[in-house]
């Protein structure tokens, strides 16, 4: 395994590519669950498999855009029976000189020239409808104005959000085919970690078991298990070897000390190392490997470093597994100077202000306080940047 220190953008793209590659491989080899069909409520937040076509037009008929009267020809108009929303469209034609009261959304009868708004006309003493405010607008929504029959509503790989589900429902969709959520396992390594209470000197509190599954779920994965692993080479190898999930996320053990066994364990179980460290700090000693139908995302043990690695690589990795496109990063403008006198990218949690992005306080690889109230992460290249410079941000999945 040759160590190649990847720039963070390249590592992010590689994680996405490897997720997509595994998804394609498992589909071809029929490994694991295939796409599932869910009703719209159950499919919210899931990823569409294949293009979603509209089974019906929106609206499905020529309809009134306002409450008022459907009219034909010039007024005054003779009034006919009212038409209300929910009424079955009639073939009875509206002839010139006639009008019918109509409610918003109701189908306009054939022959309608326009809908006169209720505030623009009135019925005179003789019972005729008379317009008192001129208007050139028709106030009629033509069938298919919003969505045409058979139109692609959303392309495959799109996440079904509530507004998208609402539009799908409006066009007559009842259920959709979605990608199965990739299963994930979290393994927290370290003899010094305790699961509850205030840690004693020499111990640290487990901050990952409660949080990493939620972050993975926000990416679209399905965490199925978490476990604690001792700083033991055999134990580490056994845990990695036994995993059958699509994604295994580990924390700790990726550096080079005598108690760091992840790299050796990956080699021992025959995993292929795909990303061997990333040129950022915090988070440099993160690893990505694959064996068979399982990807291993191995993060540093320091809390901020692990969170940086999970956001930088974990999100793109799950997106690739689900067939989603890689989310673009965009740019934010710095409100202050940010020095970086070391090689590689400096990742900082930041707050958005009217003047631009301001790095949060209390930031080291071991601190979470700066991340707790952050609006996102930003990456400052070697040499630093000055106020007014644009830098790439990375969205936090919980914001």
Please describe what each predicted stretch is.
Residues 139-250:
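Phosphate-binding glycine-rich loops and their immediate beta-loop-alpha structural context
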Residues 218-330:
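Short glycine/threonine-rich loop/turn motifs
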């Amino acid at each position: 395994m040759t160590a190649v220190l990847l720039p963070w953008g390249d590592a992010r793209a590689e994680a996405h590519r490897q997720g997509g590659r595994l998804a394609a491989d498992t589909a071809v080899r029929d490994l694991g669950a295939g796409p599932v069909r869910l009703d719209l409520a159950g499919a919210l937040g899931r990823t569409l498999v294949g293009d979603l076509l509209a089974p019906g037009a929106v609206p499905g008929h020529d309809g009134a855009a306002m409450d008022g009267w459907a009219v034909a020809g010039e007024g005054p108009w003779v009034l006919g029976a009212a038409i209300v929303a929910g009424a079955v469209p009639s073939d009875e034609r509206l002839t010139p000189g006639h009008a019918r009261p109509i409610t918003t959304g109701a189908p306009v009868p054939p022959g309608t020239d326009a809908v006169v708004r209720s505030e623009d006309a009135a019925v005179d003493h003789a019972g005729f409808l008379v317009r008192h405010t001129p208007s050139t607008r028709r106030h009629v929504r033509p069938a298919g104005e919003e969505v045409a029959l058979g139109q692609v509503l959303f392309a495959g790989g799109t996440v079904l959000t509530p507004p998208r589900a609402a539009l799908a429902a409006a066009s007559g969709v009842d259920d959709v085919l979605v990608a199965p959520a990739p299963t994930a396992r979290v393994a927290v390594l370290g003899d010094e970690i305790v699961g509850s209470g205030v840690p004693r000197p020499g111990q640290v509190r487990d901050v990952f078991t409660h949080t990493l599954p939620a972050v993975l779920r926000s990416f679209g994965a399905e965490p199925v298990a978490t476990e604690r692993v001792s700083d033991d080479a055999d134990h580490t190898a056994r845990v990695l070897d036994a995993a059958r999930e699509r994604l295994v996320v580990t924390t700790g053990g990726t550096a080079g000390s005598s108690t760091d066994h992840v790299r050796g364990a990956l080699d021992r179980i025959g995993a292929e190392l795909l990303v061997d460290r990333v040129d950022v700090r915090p988070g440099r000693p993160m690893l990505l490997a694959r064996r068979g139908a399982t990807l291993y995302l191995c993060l540093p043990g320091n809390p901020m470093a692990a969170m940086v690695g999970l956001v930088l690589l974990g999100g793109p990795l799950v997106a690739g597994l689900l067939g989603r496109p890689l989310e673009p990063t965009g740019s934010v403008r710095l409100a202050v100077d940010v020095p970086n006198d070391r090689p590689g990218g400096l990742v900082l949690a930041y707050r958005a202000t009217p003047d631009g992005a301001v790095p949060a306080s209390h930031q080291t690889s071991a601190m979470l306080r700066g991340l707790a109230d952050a609006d996102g992460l930003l990456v400052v290249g070697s040499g630093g940047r000055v106020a007014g410079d644009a830098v790439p941000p990375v969205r936090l999945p919980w914001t």
